[in-house]
Amino acid sequence: MKFLILNGPNINLARWSEPGVPGEVDYTGLMDYVQAGCDQLGIETDICQSNHEGDLIDEIQSAPGRVDGIVLTPGGYAHYSVAILDALRLCSVPAVEVMLDAPDEREPFRKTDVVSFGCQGHFIGEGPQGYLHACIWLAQLLRTDGSSKAHIVM
């Protein structure tokens, strides 16, 4: 099983706290954490980050036949990118959205999540663990007949 871990704008600059590890983790550390977790789960990964909407769409469009699932952290594009939503809907590969923080606790305009309508599952506000929870859930979805109901964790 292989997943595309697709990260949107500014994820490459953010920093997170990792449970049990003092200090902060940068993007490279975050992706190392995700990679190690996926390795333990027996999931291959193709990790990509872009600050450009078109590049994210190109990755989504090239997913069929290349990966079995998409784990998407759309960053700010979550709130207005109908183009990414359309790419997800046109793509035959199931996708799960990860939001590292809780947008409802931020500015009012972040309460709308357009991209979520193209995803089968949503993991919101879990920090780095959200990636692994999303991968586990997506793997379970793919191991069933794929007809599982949408899943939201907040």
Name what the model sees in each region.
Residues 1-4:
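Extreme N-terminal starter segment of soluble prokaryotic enzymes
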Residues 20-38:
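Short catalytic helix/loop segments, enriched in acidic residues and glycine
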Residues 44-54:
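Short beta->alpha junction loops
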Residues 63-70:
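Short acidic/histidine-rich motifs immediately flanking catalytic phosphotransfer sites
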Residues 81-90:
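Short Gly/Thr/Asp-enriched flexible loops that form oxyanion-binding sites at enzyme active sites
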Residues 89-106:
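Short, acidic/small-residue loops that bind anionic groups at enzyme active sites
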